[in-house]
């Protein structure tokens, strides 16, 4: 069993992108990387807490590798944008890999180096690689947001 934490724009889309991935057991959205204890969504959106909108993933490390999770994460957002993703602007939307072990740190740094050398992106990768801190779960209405909306409209959005 493994755990991974990623931030890359609005957490709704990142979570939805991982929810149907074989080997991903559970997802939860929340906040990490800031200085405010038990932040609320409104506080995080004020761009004063230092937190990033983050997804926590529990995964079966015998079914999916951390590298594969990194590949999926990079496919779900633009890792070259600084403090934004598309129309969403602010430090809460920054791209971050929060590692939980030296192995995750090394894997993330190697992956970013490979992506920078690949020419796949028009600019250098801006994704931060920093130690995981306290993960503060977001309010319940944010959890599995797109699955809830999709069900309301009778279809899944992802």
Swiss-Prot record:
One of its GO terms (biological process) is protein modification process. It catalyses: L-methionyl-[protein] + [thioredoxin]-disulfide + H2O = L-methionyl-(S)-S-oxide-[protein] + [thioredoxin]-dithiol; [thioredoxin]-disulfide + L-methionine + H2O = L-methionine (S)-S-oxide + [thioredoxin]-dithiol. SUPFAM superfamilies: Peptide methionine sulfoxide reductase. InterPro entries: Met_Sox_Rdtase_MsrA_dom (IPR002569), Met_Sox_Rdtase_MsrA_sf (IPR036509). GO terms for molecular function: L-methionine:thioredoxin-disulfide S-oxidoreductase activity; peptide-methionine (S)-S-oxide reductase activity. NCBIfam families: msrA. This is Peptide methionine sulfoxide reductase MsrA. It comes from Methanospirillum hungatei JF-1 (strain ATCC 27890 / DSM 864 / NBRC 100397 / JF-1).
């Amino acid at each position: 069993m493994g755990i991974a934490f990623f931030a890359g724009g609005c957490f709704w889309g990142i979570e939805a992108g991982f929810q149907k991935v074989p080997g991903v057991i559970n997802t939860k959205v929340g906040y990490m990387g800031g200085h405010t204890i038990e932040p609320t969504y409104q506080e995080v959106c004020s761009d004063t807490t230092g937190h990033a909108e983050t997804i926590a993933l529990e995964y079966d490390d015998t079914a999916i590798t951390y590298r594969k999770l990194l590949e999926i994460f990079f496919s779900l957002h633009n890792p070259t944008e600084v403090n934004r993703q598309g129309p969403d602007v602010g430090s809460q939307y920054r791209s971050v890999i929060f590692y939980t072990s030296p192995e995750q740190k090394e894997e993330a740094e190697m992956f970013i180096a490979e992506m920078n050398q690949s020419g796949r992106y028009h600019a250098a990768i801006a994704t931060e690689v920093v130690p995981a801190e306290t993960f503060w779960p977001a309010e319940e209405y944010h959890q599995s947001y797109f699955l809830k909306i999709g069900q309301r409209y009778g279809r899944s959005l992802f």
